[in-house]
Amino acid sequence: MKPLSNENLNILVLKSRSGDNASLNKIFNYFGPFIKSFTKNIYIRNFDKSDIYEECNFSILLSIKKCDIKKYNFTAYTISSIKNNIYYKIRNQAKFQSELSLNAKVTDQNCTFQDILIDKTNHFKNLSIKNALTSLDKKEQDIIDHIYFLGYSSIEYSKKSGINYRTCLRRKNSALKKLKRKLN
């Protein structure tokens, strides 16, 4: 911090309370080196360095407004106010450890959560359906594949595969129930 006597600093505080922007800037410049050295090793989730710096400047503004300069040393009051505010922000952010970032990798295919939300090709929906389809046996996979993906009707599939129509319907319904359980 640049050497400024306590009396000069108190005069700047009084001027800035009355609305003098030049004295307010001098106070910000006075505490600037302290803020830079203090915040150098501070990390707060979802805050970048400029956000932390602005929080410190906000603490200075609150100190200007609230500090009784007749009772307290303004420099000590402001420094403790800055530290307390930043430590409060750190404690407050520590409560949210289980947050998920939109840029976090969520699958083994290096996709982010944001990719899944924006997915216009329904790639991820298809992945879960494919996983559910692999859990079916070959006959059930075949009937689902022919009826729903290749466009056969139940009658056409029963004639093509040489099975009874009722058996075809039972297999199809059984396969659909298994798929529903897997997808839910």
Swiss-Prot record:
The keyword tRNA-binding does not apply. It comes from the Bacteria. Disulfide bonds: none annotated. GO terms for molecular function: DNA-binding transcription factor activity. GO terms for biological process: DNA-templated transcription initiation. Keywords: Plasmid. InterPro entries: RNA_pol_sigma-70_dom, RNA_pol_sigma70_r2, RNA_pol_sigma_r2, RNA_pol_sigma_r3/r4-like, WH-like_DNA-bd_sf. This is Uncharacterized protein CA_P0167.
